[in-house]
Amino acid sequence: MADEISNPVDPSQSLKRPLEGEQLEEAHPPQPILPEDSAVTKAEKVERNGTNGDSVDNGEPSAKRVRIEEKNHKPTAADSRDRIRGIAPVKAEYLIQPAGSRSATDDRNPAENDDDAEGKPRGDERDNGGKKKKKAKGQNKDRQFGSWGDKIKLCNSISNSSEFSPKECSFGDSCKCEHNLRKYLAEGRRADLTTFNSKCPVWEDNGTCLAGWKCRFVGSHSKEIQREDGRMELVLIDDSDRMGDTALGYEEALGSVVNVISTKDKIDLAKKKTPMEKSDLYTTWLDQNSEEVNRQSNLRKDQKNDQTEEEKQENRARYVEPPFLPSEKRRIYFGPETPVLAPLTTQGNLPFRRLCVELGAQLTYSEMAMSIPLLQGQKSEWALMKAHKSEVTPPRVNSDRTSIVRKYDNSKDLKFGTQISASKPFMAIKAAEVLSRFVPHLRVIDLNCGCPIELVYRQGAGSALLDAPSKLEKMIRGMNAVSGEVPITAKIRMGTMTGKPTAFKTIERLAFGGVESRERLGAPGCAAITLHGRSRQQRYTKSADWSYIAECAALVKSYNQKKDDLTDTVMEPDARTLPNAPDGKIHFIGNGDCYSHIDYLDHIQNAGVDSVMVARGALIKPWLFEEIEKGQVLDKSASERLEYVEKFTRYGLEAWGSDEIGVGQTRRFLLEWLSFAHRYVPAGILEHLPPSLQDRPPAYRGRNDLETLLASDNYMDWMKISEMFLGPAHEGFKFQPKHKSNSYEIEAEG
């Protein structure tokens, strides 16, 4: 399998398995390589665990980071643990034991202890004679999902056909799949599910179910009829008034999924038959221009001063203009009324985004896609581009505020954007060209400059771009040149090292370009910048620094004035080099620790950002977007929260299919989401509002049995919740939380 997996960041660099005894920086458990994994996930698993999924374990504890305490903490007159920092303030009557007791905190399931998985515990030397307790490791070793599928595999030639009218099998007599439909139904599959009133939710919504006879609800859309010759035939039932064109494929037939690239286009990409004229021209010019810039930069200062006017003119003539200028971009808008759902690896799947849009998210992003696998036509990477039809509707905006962006047309705007990662300019530029060509419903293409994954960082992508500002500028400038009308944006962190923020310089370069290119080429054309208020080194061991985000927001607001100072006043800058022409306004979005409408409004009003991007807060309570819209804390009941689980399940079956494999996929991603959602503490049992994202729940009982179940940190209870809608799990299905901490790092959410 290892031979088939190349480095998705830079194919010229081989994947490096950890040496024996080498300590890994991140605490990730060994995981099997799954067919549906994206390229970066597959490569990371090879690097961490080797090619066979065996764990690398030298018997020593995993590397852990020191927990950084909040500043200005004032202890009470009594024991400072009476009000435990980092523990949600649950009312006493709901605590299983007092909040300061050992069992309410230390004996809580290790899945609740963020520090065990993400930071090195400080310990409490007042206990056990000053000796620190030994903490559980922050990894689940040998994490596996198992496998699931039908006992007998039904041939696709009959899976969607009537019993007596199968399609021609392309394998003929050599086919190893079952062609006897009645035998398959009797012996080759598990019994129909009885959830959802025994009715297929996919068929109920779309009038067809392309899982056909493999559907776990097939009894609700099939029947047995008597033919003229007296034979009884099994047939599938469709509602032609509601179904799409089944010949187009699964998503197109359902009509709810967009941005589906054709198989032919993916094959052409894999065979390098897809023409990329713009990218080729631009990268050729970029290489030539870079050589001349480097030559001039290497001249000593005295050499430059001694140059005659004729030599200076000759040097200017060496510079060649770009082969073409960017197309004028579609206007975009970010405002207080447009909360943004962050790009989330694994969790940011289509069903979850669909649920968040339904609850009020105005802007969404795909999971981070790697440029090289996209250019190679890999199915798993292009699958990340799929969006639900609700994501391609215009965001809700305030017409009074949208006037800030002249010529903004809300009817042409949409919610869904994509995020990519690249380590070299040509990768980002070519990926931007193919995305703008093959993905028709795309709001923006966002360049990830904050991903802290070691594999990505080591190859020069993600947060490594923060330390390579010239390369970052070339990427943004080139992507802007080839992306047609699709705007280019960037997501950055404060910097790579704690205490050494570099966002000021990064933002200035994204806004105006470097000094070596500013005068000749103008602005790079970055339409929006999102700043995550942490460094790469910090990860999630400290609260996001919103004071620094506010300083950066002030810098962005001064953009128009600085633009006037830095551009040639004699010649009006070309509108096509500006991000939101003709205004040239860069939108600025803040990201980090938003968990309530109060946090959101505070960041808008006091930090001065245009909008706020929400990540973990939305995973724990997706109705955060509804709270932002209504301006109040919503105390969702257990039954309401269970309805969201049901919706996710319905959306998952529609996205991944209602056959055995699709049910297993839906269950897996539901459990991944519940590993976050169980951390929610109902507002009605908290002593203080608003809640804090950094607070972990103590051991408590809910207001009813269902609320207690939803709060369980035992993944077997999450399995019970999944069985309410998906029935008993397949005997081969396995699941363990990705970390013992349910708030494991969303690594690609840079």
UniProtKB/Swiss-Prot annotation:
Entry's Gene Ontology cellular component terms: cytoplasm; nuclear periphery
Gene: dus3
UniProt KW keywords: Cytoplasm, Flavoprotein, FMN, Metal-binding, mRNA processing, NAD, NADP, Nucleus, Oxidoreductase, Repeat, tRNA processing, Zinc, Zinc-finger
Main location: cytoplasm
CDD domains: DUS_like_FMN
Listed cofactors: FMN
Record-given protein name: tRNA-dihydrouridine(47) synthase [NAD(P)(+)]
Segments traversing the membrane: none
Biological role: Catalyzes the synthesis of dihydrouridine, a modified base found in the D-loop of most tRNAs. Specifically modifies U47 in cytoplasmic tRNAs. Catalyzes the synthesis of dihydrouridine in some mRNAs, thereby affecting their translation.
Annotated FMN binding sites: 343-345, 419, 491, 532, 591-593, 615-616
Gene3D superfamilies, A to Z: Aldolase class I (3.20.20.70)
Catalysis performed (reactions): 5,6-dihydrouridine(47) in tRNA + NAD(+) = uridine(47) in tRNA + NADH + H(+); 5,6-dihydrouridine(47) in tRNA + NADP(+) = uridine(47) in tRNA + NADPH + H(+); a 5,6-dihydrouridine in mRNA + NAD(+) = a uridine in mRNA + NADH + H(+); a 5,6-dihydrouridine in mRNA + NADP(+) = a uridine in mRNA + NADPH + H(+)
Extent of Basic and acidic residues compositional bias: 17-28, 62-73, 118-130
Organism listed in the record: Botryotinia fuckeliana (strain B05.10)
One annotated GO molecular function: tRNA-dihydrouridine47 synthase activity
